[in-house]
Amino acid sequence: MRTTYMAKPGEVERKWYVIDATDIALGRLSTVVASILRGKNKPTFTPNVDTGDNIIVINAEKIKLTGRKATDKLYHHHSNHPGGLKTRTAGEIRENNPERLIEMSVKGMLPKNSLGHNQFLKLHVYAGGEHKHQAQNPEVLDITDII
């Protein structure tokens, strides 16, 4: 009888990938990034073990919002004070803090538990074309072939 392979945390080999977000739709980029962070692109994927890789996303300021999402998509948060509901559009967030837009999108696609939190910590987003992870020798991942 064959048994299913279950990865152990010490056996996982992690790679580093760089993804250029220029002119890629936010949702399509986020689904690919979330899948790689979870490790679903590997044959050794195990749901209860963090088998994912590290992702560096550059040029977050050049992400594409399709349709009228830049003006119509709203993000809400509350300050926990009376009348403290704050609302910002996706376009405002892209102008002021483009890294946050990708982080919020990817975080919503990860599990809502400690495993998802640890997977989210392996995401590194930069607004410009430069990043500080050259020492890890990241591979350039062209996701236009995937999406």
Swiss-Prot record:
GO terms for biological process: negative regulation of translation; translation. InterPro entries: Ribosomal_uL13, Ribosomal_uL13_bac-type, Ribosomal_uL13_CS, Ribosomal_uL13_sf. GO terms for cellular component: cytosolic large ribosomal subunit. Pfam families: Ribosomal_L13 (PF00572). GO terms for molecular function: mRNA binding; structural constituent of ribosome. It comes from the Bacteria. Keywords: Ribonucleoprotein, Ribosomal protein. The keyword Transferase does not apply. Belongs to the universal ribosomal protein uL13 family. Part of the 50S ribosomal subunit. NCBIfam families: rplM_bact (TIGR01066). This protein is one of the early assembly proteins of the 50S ribosomal subunit, although it is not seen to bind rRNA by itself. It is important during the early stages of 50S assembly. This is Large ribosomal subunit protein uL13. It comes from Latilactobacillus sakei subsp. sakei (strain 23K) (Lactobacillus sakei subsp. sakei).
